[in-house]
Amino acid sequence: MKNNLLKLRKERNLTQLSLQMQTGIEQALLSKFERGERIPPTETLVVLAEFYGVSIDYLLCRTEKPEVNR
C-alpha cells in the first residue's frame, strides 16, 4: 500500500502538507502510511480513495487497476 499512496501523491505534485490541508488527515500520519509504518483505518482509506478517485483495493495493492467500479 505504501507505494501506491506515495505514487498517487507524487503524480499529483502534492506535498504531505497540502494533502493534509485538502483531506484533514494529519501529515505525520500520511508519512507513516506512505512508509508502511501504519495501516490507515477504514475511514481514512475511504477519504483517500475518494480524494484520489481510486478504489480502496488499489490503495491496498489488491489490484493494479486504480479505477473505481461504480
Residue spans for each PLM region:
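DNA major-groove recognition helix of helix-turn-helix/homeodomain DNA-binding modules
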Residues: 24, 43-58
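Recognition helix of helix-turn-helix/homeodomain-like DNA-binding domains
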Residues: 24-40
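Short, charged recognition helix plus adjacent turn
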Residues: 7, 11, 50, 60-70
